[in-house]
Amino acid sequence: MHAPDADPRHFPMKELEFVLMMASFQALQALAIDIMLPALGAISRDLELADPNQRQLVIGVFLICSGLGSLFPGALADRFGRRPVVLTAIAAYMLLSVLCAISGSFQLLLVARGVMGAVTSAMMVMPTTILRDRFDGDRMARTQSLIVMTFMVVPMIAPMLGQTVLLFAGWRWIFGIMGVLAGCVFGWAWLRLPETLDPRNRQAVQFKVIAGNMGTALRERSSIGYFLGAAFTQGAMFGYLNSAQQLVGEHFGAGTLFPVLFGGMALVMACTNFANSRIVERFGARRVSHAALLVYIVLGVVHLLLAFRGEDLWTFLPLMTLSMCMMAFMGSNFQAISLQPFKRIAGAAASVMSFVRVVLGAVLGSLIGQAYDGTARPILAAMVVFGVIALLLVLYSERGRLFRRINPPEYYRNNPPAVTPPAS
């Protein structure tokens, strides 16, 4: 699995291929969530679940285990490199897709989904780490927005793909499609992905070193408010994902239109990420994300008040889509800001941030999902509360001041000094 170290100044991929490859890594993990949404009802009937809300565990267990597993890929990648970790994760994804497909009980399916989430968490951590290897600050936020915009194709088409499979075959075939797609991405990465870890930044695989690097990431005030804030807003989104099929498909009566409506929301979010990639280098990641967070809170309050007065699908959907768009403006920018201080330990920092963001977000999302009462009120109330908490956390990181430009890498004590290339 060895590839020559890539000099960032002479990276072998053009930007388009790089964006597509990083998006494909993240898309595989998103596919494991979104393609399952139309199948949850079929799984519930086929495996004879007593409580209809249990079906949400197919999503919730995967997300929680993804967060728990994300502690490890970064530390391994800081020692052995990004490429071997990525390839191992994709290979495991293929094998575990087969195990999910042949599961004979709901318990075995949950175990397989949990292991799949843990092992393949690298596919969310590594793109961020590789991106941090190559870019800083607002440029990183711009490229991350392009990656997210591209990867948003998955939630646009995955539910419709899952629905199509169910028309012609059982839910188990969905996992077969996941395995085949993972095989294609594995071949592409094997042939084209170079190693981006600077040999000077290679870290030892020792508990003391790993714990020290993760502790450094957790102690950085300028970072912690952003990735904790992202965890709370992501928790609200996970809560919506967990309940989306019941809320939109059943309560609001969308029925078979649910995958189309879900995909339409994802399309709008993809456009938002493209807009972010166009404006973030001009206005700065902080200014864009701070404005989005404030609008997100206001939208949540307005939507919650409407929900108590009574709403239909065509009131709910536009307002929820606007809220998700604000999350799109926050996501890439929060990530870039929180990783800015950690060029030397990018893998460990990305891992611990992903762990906190996904585990906390998944736990909060599962609690929201289990609180589903046949209305949108639990989700909307969580969005307001979690949005306010995120704002307080950002204010802590910013020492009470919003809308500043992002600091250069050399501002932070955790980053090595810039190396000037020798004159030719």
Q: Where are the model-predicted features located?
A:
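Juxtamembrane intracellular "pre-TM" segments in multi-pass secondary transporters
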Residues: 2-12, 194-226
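Helix-breaking motifs and short loop linkers at transmembrane-helix boundaries and internal kinks
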Residues: 49, 81, 102-108, 119, ...
